[in-house]
Amino acid sequence: MTEASENASATGGVAVVIVAAGRGARAGQANGPKQYQNIGGRAVIAHTLEIFLAHPRTDRIVVAIHADDHELFRQAAGSQAERVTAIIGGPTRQESVRLGLLALKEHAPGQVLIHDAVRPFVDADLIDRTISAIGENEGALPALPVADTLKRESAAGVVAETVSRSGLHAAQTPQGFPYGPILAAHDKAFQLGRLDFTDDAAIAEWAHIPVKLVPGSPDNVKLTWARDIAMAHQRLSSERTHFPDIRTGNGYDVHAFEPGDHVTLCGVAIPHDKKLSGHSDADVGLHALTDALLATCGAGDIGTHFPPSDPQWKGAASRIFVEHAAKVVRQRGGRIANADITLICEAPRVGPHREAMTAALSRMLGISADRISIKATTNEKLGFVGREEGIAAIATASVVFPGEVPE
């Protein structure tokens, strides 16, 4: 786990509410609600979910959908649907958010991001900026300064005045808040019949919760009109015509046995009559994968980031290393496409624990289980592995980076 995600966990984690219950009349209904329309080969909501599921600082995700959209959501989200909680939203965006916040109550997150499903071009950096700006009793709003000249219309349909754009910003999502205060604000607005707020920063303002502005992104557009869907599809289709920058990294690690009662492999403790010797928990599989991930963006190796001479890593869980490497990859624009680990040992048996290992890696990397492969083989009694003196691991990671392969 990264340092940032460790801090978030200590305060209850960073949850996400994604609002996807709207009917999208302005974008047209010919192809269904806009969050389920196809752009670049997938539904809009699938692009949105991918970003948040992959982000190392986000935790539980709740999606508020329309009562009629169960099958649409299942088809659009695919394997992602198993990793989020879908609830029935309300008749308005405001009520859908309130219901989403209530669905998180038993999990008591420390912070929450609220995002429109129809903003599929949100990026990891914007999410990071928003989370980092959330205070103990202070929200965070990504926004862009208004660039267009603004006119106020009169009742007669003519220009009444030119509005100064000084200090004006266009609000975006995700909007971030400490969980308790924003839930209380939504509940109070509901009880008082104040159902006219158009975003959550407005509710926070009404409830006297300070909201800090953070730089938004020009790419983080909301798909509102039919032409927006067409432009988004064109944008993604155009990006896919380039030869993608797919990079592959390899990692290798080995640890010797010493007296103990279990080994930790790929994040799972396995009972054994020995343990692996190392400065951390000696998870040979995760160490190899950490090197493989870092190799995809030329970011050194595990020893560069977590030197064994540093006492703070003594006995540390190796998931910290993997999640850090995944964050480094994402900060450099990468998207993890696949992770493959081969464990080389005579014992213990890996097969009975493969499913748990895959699930653990899925959580660490923020990718679906079908993009993870964990294999095991013996060394046919040859060498130190064959003599059961230790375990070796080989890992390969594939990462897609933006842009094209340079000539």
Swiss-Prot record:
Pathway annotation from the record: Isoprenoid biosynthesis; isopentenyl diphosphate biosynthesis via DXP pathway; isopentenyl diphosphate from 1-deoxy-D-xylulose 5-phosphate: step 2/6; Isoprenoid biosynthesis; isopentenyl diphosphate biosynthesis via DXP pathway; isopentenyl diphosphate from 1-deoxy-D-xylulose 5-phosphate: step 4/6
PANTHER family associated with the record: 2-C-METHYL-D-ERYTHRITOL 2,4-CYCLODIPHOSPHATE SYNTHASE, CHLOROPLASTIC
Disulfide bond sites: none
Membrane-spanning ranges: none
Keywords: Isoprene biosynthesis, Lyase, Metal-binding, Multifunctional enzyme, Nucleotidyltransferase, Transferase
Entry annotated with the keyword Membrane: no
Lineage of source species: Bacteria, Pseudomonadati, Pseudomonadota, Alphaproteobacteria, Hyphomicrobiales
Record protein name field: Bifunctional enzyme IspD/IspF
Names of the cofactor(s): a divalent metal cation
Amino-acid positions noted as binding a divalent metal cation in the UniProt annotation, renumbered to this chain: D253, H255, H287
GO BP field: isopentenyl diphosphate biosynthetic process, methylerythritol 4-phosphate pathway; terpenoid biosynthetic process
Residues that coordinate or bind 4-CDP-2-C-methyl-D-erythritol 2-phosphate: D253, V254, H255, H279, S280, D301, I302, G303, T377, T378, N379, E380, F384, R387
A Pfam family of this chain: IspD
Role: Bifunctional enzyme that catalyzes the formation of 4-diphosphocytidyl-2-C-methyl-D-erythritol from CTP and 2-C-methyl-D-erythritol 4-phosphate (MEP) (IspD), and catalyzes the conversion of 4-diphosphocytidyl-2-C-methyl-D-erythritol 2-phosphate (CDP-ME2P) to 2-C-methyl-D-erythritol 2,4-cyclodiphosphate (ME-CPP) with a corresponding release of cytidine 5-monophosphate (CMP) (IspF).
UniProt-listed SUPFAM superfamilies: IpsF-like, Nucleotide-diphospho-sugar transferases
Gene name, Swiss-Prot/TrEMBL: ispDF
InterPro entries: IspD, IspD/F, IspD/TarI, ISPD_synthase_CS, MECDP_synthase, MECDP_synthase_CS, MECDP_synthase_sf, Nucleotide-diphossugar_trans
Region spans: 2-C-methyl-D-erythritol 4-phosphate cytidylyltransferase: 1-246
Chain positions of site Transition state stabilizer: R26, K34, H279, T378
Family: In the N-terminal section; belongs to the IspD/TarI cytidylyltransferase family. IspD subfamily. In the C-terminal section; belongs to the IspF family.
Enzyme Commission identifier(s): 2.7.7.60, 4.6.1.12
